[in-house]
């Protein structure tokens, strides 16, 4: 079937024309529309069809394709159903090549080899896997070639010559050239420097055809791009037209749009019998066009993986962002002046944060001696300021004037806005609309500090969606923008970078505890776990001190036996999400779950890869605390120690108290109080009527009997 792709481009070249490639998301606008739209494409004169495999978190795509994915998933489309649509289209006479385009996690969840075999049987010709890194592509391509199909690599304006050389070896039918940095979507004009990009790519791809996409929507665009490329890809425009078309008219809309692009030109297509004969022969005699490299190793100063977890599972355009960031980070941490600059800010932060015993909490829990590491006393009220200031220093070293950040509870947003105000950089914070509602105080704090807050209305309107939007913005505005990721999540180098800057928490804890306990180590350290910034910061300095138990407490929401929780390590499975392989809350089709937590800062369906590694090796243990249990932790610390903790930290307080009960009175554990709780007072007031009775806590005002 890869041979059919090669023949398609060869025929177009022989006929002195460009191959037209059109895109549609499977199951959009409805499931029953998909096959008619594909037939409309073919009848209009399309050479190749890209069929999008719906995914819950398509970070490389703009609003149009995002919407089509969301609608398709709401329509119940799964990966097996997508393959069934391909099979149905073939049986109804669609014989032009069909390429399945999508993201890696649903394929990984399905099983790569089984998925490729099933796709070949259904009648697919190949795949574009948007976020598949080259080192993984080498393995996957072998499965694909064994089944006679093709893996089409994506290259971007930012793709290095080294990567171009590798990707040209991967290509056995054609290469998809992303014409501009950013996400998919209609543009008013084609990229002005396209000639130069195509020329650079051809140095490595030689005679392999190049198809160019991103922003093409008119016949004029088609002709302009076609003057330098072999094929032209159109996606968002036709998705919009079909979505807007009335029911029963979508075949006609697809056909007429393609005819307009091609000015009515047609080409010969295979009959149904010819196609099935071609498919049968292809499956029997799969062959590889050219040799492929066995391995691909880019140089990295710091390992990009933690065991099986980590990596850089991102769209090709994002590699430029990560490469620049990694180089800047490597140089900074090797430069003593960077650390001098950072440590000179300790007095501004309020470091070292205090460590002290919680006498009354210890007495209440009746077990180990409980200590509190008071990150809530930092400037801005949480541990987030450590990472935010360090990354803003890094942004200045890289010459960036604009800083963006994502935030859930708002603590990271406030910390980043604070750092930007101190150093004179502009700050834009992406925040889910639901989090904007429940964390109004922090939103106003950010605005007071001069930051612009963008409420993200996609998806669940929480941290996950804010993170996706921040990545999309970054790749479009790399030249001037630095992205301060707030947790130990995302592609390399972010997990290493955030852990490095937050490890001051664990280092101080170790030193302070030893100074007060004759050089001893604590027996356990406890932290809440969302993405992992405070937990990796607390745990990493103790990683090799195996006598110290590491306990992470996740957000159990309504309970891990329900759908309403954020306990990724407790209830998730390995997958790929936001550019990294880690534990992910996902359904049976590999779609990322909606999450729930009373705490906005823990409301995230992934987790840092280092935490995933520690779980897999047994070095750290993880439990989940429900919303009610977290509220109990909130109450205990408030009323026994006079410290109102953040709801995030309240999970750790509850988990630590339960752990302390199993320990001896001469043992010691430390809780990382990652943030203060003034931001959560309104949230607690909202949930108390529901959760208060579960823990025996009623704060309602009694009526004055004398009134």
From Swiss-Prot:
This is Tryptophan synthase. Its cofactor is pyridoxal 5'-phosphate. Keywords: Amino-acid biosynthesis, Aromatic amino acid biosynthesis, Lyase, Phosphoprotein, Pyridoxal phosphate, Tryptophan biosynthesis. The gene is TRP5. It is an enzyme of class 4 (lyase). Its EC number is 4.2.1.20. It comes from the Eukaryota. It comes from Saccharomyces cerevisiae (strain ATCC 204508 / S288c) (Baker's yeast). PANTHER family: TRYPTOPHAN SYNTHASE (PTHR48077:SF3), TRYPTOPHAN SYNTHASE-RELATED (PTHR48077). Residues 1-297 are annotated as: Tryptophan synthase alpha chain. GO terms for molecular function: tryptophan synthase activity. Residues 298-707 are annotated as: Tryptophan synthase beta chain. The keyword Amino-acid biosynthesis applies. In the N-terminal section; belongs to the TrpA family. In the C-terminal section; belongs to the TrpB family. InterPro entries: Aldolase_TIM (IPR013785), RibuloseP-bd_barrel (IPR011060), Trp_synth_b_CS (IPR006653), Trp_synth_beta (IPR006654), Trp_synth_beta/beta-like (IPR023026), Trp_synthase_alpha_AS (IPR018204), Trp_synthase_suA (IPR002028), TrpB-like_PALP (IPR001926).
């Amino acid at each position: 079937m890869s041979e059919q792709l090669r023949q398609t481009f060869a025929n177009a070249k022989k006929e002195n024309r460009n191959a037209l490639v059109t895109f549609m998301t499977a199951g959009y606008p409805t499931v029953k529309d998909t096959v008619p739209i594909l037939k409309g494409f073919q009848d209009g004169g399309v050479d190749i069809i890209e069929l999008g495999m719906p995914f819950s978190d398509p970070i490389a795509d703009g609003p149009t394709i995002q919407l089509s994915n969301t609608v398709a998933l709401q329509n119940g489309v799964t990966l097996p159903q997508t393959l069934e649509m391909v099979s149905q289209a073939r049986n109804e006479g669609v014989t032009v090549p069909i390429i399945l385009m999508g993201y890696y996690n649903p394929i990984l969840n399905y099983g790569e080899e089984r998925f490729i075999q099933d796709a070949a049987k259904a009648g697919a010709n190949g795949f574009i896997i948007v976020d598949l890194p080259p080192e993984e592509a080498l393995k996957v391509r072998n499965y694909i070639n064994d089944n006679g199909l093709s893996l089409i690599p994506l290259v971007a304006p930012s793709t290095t010559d080294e990567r171009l050389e590798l990707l040209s070896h991967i290509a056995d039918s054609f290469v998809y050239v992303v014409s501009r940095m950013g996400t998919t979507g209609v543009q008013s004009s084609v990229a002005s420097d396209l000639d130069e990009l195509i020329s650079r790519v051809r140095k490595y791809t030689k005679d392999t055809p190049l198809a160019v996409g991103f922003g093409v929507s008119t016949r004029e665009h088609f002709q302009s791009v076609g003057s330098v490329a072999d094929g032209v890809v159109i996606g968002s425009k036709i998705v919009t037209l079909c979505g807007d078309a009335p029911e029963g008219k979508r075949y006609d809309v697809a056909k007429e749009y393609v005819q307009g692009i091609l000015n009515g030109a047609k080409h010969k297509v295979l009959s149904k019998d010819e196609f099935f004969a071609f498919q049968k022969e292809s499956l029997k005699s799969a062959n590889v066009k050219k040799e492929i490299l066995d391995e691909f190793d880019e140089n990295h100063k710091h390992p990009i993986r933690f065991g099986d977890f980590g990596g850089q599972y991102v769209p090709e355009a994002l590699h430029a962002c990560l490469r620049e960031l990694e180089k800047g980070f490597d140089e900074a941490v090797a430069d003593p002046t960077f650390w001098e600059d950072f440590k000179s800010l300790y007095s501004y932060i309020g470091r070292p944060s205090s460590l002290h015993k919680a006498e009354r909490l210890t007495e209440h829990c009746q077990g180990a001696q409980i200590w509190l590491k008071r990150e809530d006393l930092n400037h801005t009220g949480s541990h987030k300021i450590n990472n935010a200031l360090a990354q803003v220093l890094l942004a200045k070293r890289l010459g960036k004037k604009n800083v963006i950040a994502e935030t859930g509870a708002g603590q990271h947003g406030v910390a980043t806005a604070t750092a930007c105000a101190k150093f004179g950089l502009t700050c834009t914070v992406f925040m889910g609309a639901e989090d904007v509602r429940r964390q109004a105080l922090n939103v106003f704090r950010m605005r007071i500090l001069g930051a612009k807050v963008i409420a993200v209305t996609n998806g669940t309107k929480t941290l996950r969606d804010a993170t996706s939007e921040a990545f999309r913005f970054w790749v479009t505005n790399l030249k001037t923008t630095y992205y301060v990721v707030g947790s130990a999540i995302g592609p390399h180098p972010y997990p290493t970078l955030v852990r490095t800057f937050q490890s001051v928490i664990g280092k101080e804890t170790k030193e302070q505890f030893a100074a007060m306990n004759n050089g001893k180590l604590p027996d356990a350290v406890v932290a809440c776990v969302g993405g992992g910034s405070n937990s990796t910061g607390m745990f990493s300095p103790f990683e090799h001190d195996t006598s110290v138990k590491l306990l992470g407490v996740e957000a159990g929401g309504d309970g891990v036996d329900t759908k309403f929780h954020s306990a990724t390590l407790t209830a998730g499975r390995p997958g790929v999400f936001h550019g990294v392989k880690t534990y992910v809350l996902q359904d049976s089709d590999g779609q990322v779950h909606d999450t729930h937590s009373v705490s906005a800062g823990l409301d995230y369906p992934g987790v840092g890869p280092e935490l995933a590694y520690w779980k897999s090796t047994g070095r750290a243990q993880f439990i989940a605390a429900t919303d009610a249990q977290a509220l109990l932790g909130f109450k205990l610390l408030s009323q026994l120690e006079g410290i109102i903790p953040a709801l995030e930290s309240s999970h750790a307080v509850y988990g630590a108290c339960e752990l302390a009960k199993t320990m001896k009175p001469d043992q010691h554990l430390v809780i990382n109080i990652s943030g203060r709780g003034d931001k959560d007072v309104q949230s607690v007031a909202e949930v108390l009527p529901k959760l208060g009775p579960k823990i025996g806590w009623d704060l309602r005002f009694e009526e004055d009997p004398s009134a």
